[in-house]
Design a protein with these regions (language model features):
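A short, proline-enriched helix->beta-strand linker immediately N-terminal to the Walker B motif
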Residues: 151-155
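Conserved ABC transporter NBD signature motif
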Residues: 63-75
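Helix-to-loop junction immediately C-terminal to a conserved catalytic motif
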Residues: 55
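Conserved ABC ATPase "signature" region
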Residues: 110-128, 180
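Short coil-to-helix segment of the ABC ATPase nucleotide-binding domain corresponding to the Q-loop/switch region
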Residues: 92-99
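Conserved ABC ATPase signature
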Residues: 132-136, 140
Length: 247
């Protein structure tokens, strides 16, 4: 059976007034259905560009992106995209925010509304559904943004550093919550992060993207029950680890 997602020697350049800038070159990797894969690398190495290509926001100049064996542009599989900021509309309630994608795509049905209600109830936002985003904590806002994405039932979920705007301790807690939600919902996910510890704790595999525009897949051999939860207090957990020397 073909991989849910496959990138085959994908390349892209940006054309600027000062010349051509190579953003990605010969990038190849795959993601199987049900996997949680992290794409790790320093700022400016093209991690977000990879997600934009997969989402169809950019078109590769070289290579091909396929989903279950079909070219990305011909695939009927839906892709959800969760960005760094939650992008909740402050003048809408949480319930109105999470229904927004369904309304735009004209997919608001009895079944989809029931699905949204279940997500809100199971993940602690049901009692806040008529609140506005400004009344919620950063972690609750991210949960609302995730539910808005899951409401569309995507086959693949792209996560572009969704915890980067949170403080370190909140980031640990929210990443635990989101990992549990995605596992319970059986979703396939590709996470972009520059935090190696975050990638290892959440992923089945880690793909390292370097400034040399190359990628290298690494399987995480540590069982999940030994990696989680990351929110357990540790004497040396006051500051985030410095992973800048790993690239």
């Amino acid at each position: 059976m073909p991989a849910l997602l496959e990138l085959d020697h994908v390349g892209l350049s940006y054309h600027t007034l000062s010349g051509e800038i190579q953003a990605l070159s010969q990038i190849s990797f795959s993601v199987q259905e049900g996997e949680f894969v992290s794409l790790v690398g320093p700022s400016g190495c093209g991690k977000s560009t990879v997600l934009n290509l997969i989402a169809g926001l950019l078109i590769p100049e070289q290579g091909q992106i396929t989903m279950q064996g079909l070219p990305r542009e011909h695939s009927v599989l839906s892709v959800g995209y969760m960005l760094q900021k939650d992008h909740l509309f402050e003048w809408l309630t949480i319930y109105e925010n999470v229904l927004l994608g369904l309304e735009i795509q004209k997919r608001k049905t009895k079944e989809s509304l029931s699905h949204v209600d279940r997500l809100l109830q199971e993940y602690g936002l049901w009692n806040f559904r008529f609140s506005h985003p400004s009344q919620l904590s950063g972690g609750m806002r991210q949960r609302a943004a995730l539910i808005r994405t899951l409401a569309l039932e995507p086959a693949l979920l792209l996560l572009d550093e969704p915890f980067s705007a949170l403080d370190y301790q909140t980031r640990l807690s929210v990443s635990d919550d989101i990992w549990k939600i995605l596992r319970k919902e059986g979703k396939t996910a590709l996470l972009v992060t520059h935090d190696i510890s975050e990638a290892i704790s959440m992923s089945d595999r880690v793909i390292i993207l370097s400034k040399a525009l190359t990628c290298r897949p690494v399987r995480v051999p540590i069982p999940h029950h030994l990696r989680r939860p990351r929110t357990t207090p540790m004497p040396d957990a006051k500051l985030p680890p410095n992973s800048s020397n790993n690239f």
